[in-house]
Amino acid sequence: MTQDEMKKAAGWAALQYVEKDSIVGVGTGSTVNHFIDALATMKADIDGAVSSSEASTEKMKSLGIPVYDLNSVDDLSVYVDGADEINGHMDMIKGGGAALTREKIVAAVADKFICIVDNTKQVDILGEFPLPVEVIPMARSYVARQLVKLGGDPVYREGVVTDNGNIILDVYNMKIMTPKELEEQINAIVGVVTNGLFAMRGADVLLVGTPEGVKTVK
């Protein structure tokens, strides 16, 4: 099984958590694209979706899945999204695709977070994948200095503007032993919109694509 086939298996496995007549929260990324393909097969059975990025919105609309603004939706039964890293406590690093803020907002609304990954994303300790931080542009240098004080090595992701019009600093060389604490510390820096640690709101169910099939962790 190739890595993409493992992603596809995890994406399709998430369909079992989609409730009939519900509005589904949908994340962003290569694994989620497989989930969107799967979701299109039952678009007649759901009311539609809320998306965490312009890219996912475009893909869903092209497949005929109705996409709603989050402000017009009271609740979501599930949010399905991938991760760049996930540990044994269901804490994640997300935001490799720069959609972390919208992903975090949609995840906060959903009753259940279903994380879909291939087996390369499982780690014991978060931090080998650089931690994305969304920053208001004028605060870039200040925030970078504060991130250095926290032990990180921030690098400006050149040429990337988020869907919210902000920039991304990728923080390298962090061994993240206390994800919740670090998530709060970084979010407390003035000028930070949010960071890619999903620890205060981690995953509820993990679906891992492996060469032997999909493994479920709860």
Curated annotation (Swiss-Prot):
PANTHER family in the record: RIBOSE-5-PHOSPHATE ISOMERASE
NCBIfam families: PRK00702.1 (NF001924), rpiA (TIGR00021)
Role of this protein: Catalyzes the reversible conversion of ribose-5-phosphate to ribulose 5-phosphate.
SUBUNIT field: Homodimer.
The protein's enzyme class: isomerase
Positions annotated to bind substrate: 28-31, 81-84, 94-97, 121
Gene Ontology CC annotations of this record: cytosol
Pathway: Carbohydrate degradation; pentose phosphate pathway; D-ribose 5-phosphate from D-ribulose 5-phosphate (non-oxidative stage): step 1/1
Domain of life: Bacteria
The name this protein goes by in its record: Ribose-5-phosphate isomerase A
Keyword Isomerase found: yes
Active site, per annotation: 103 (proton acceptor)
Entry EC number(s): 5.3.1.6
Gene Ontology BP, a term: pentose-phosphate shunt, non-oxidative branch
GO molecular function: ribose-5-phosphate isomerase activity
InterPro entries assigned: NagB/RpiA_transferase-like (IPR037171), Ribose5P_isomerase_typA_subgr (IPR020672), Ribose5P_isomerase_type_A (IPR004788)
Keywords: Isomerase
Family: Belongs to the ribose 5-phosphate isomerase family.
Gene: rpiA
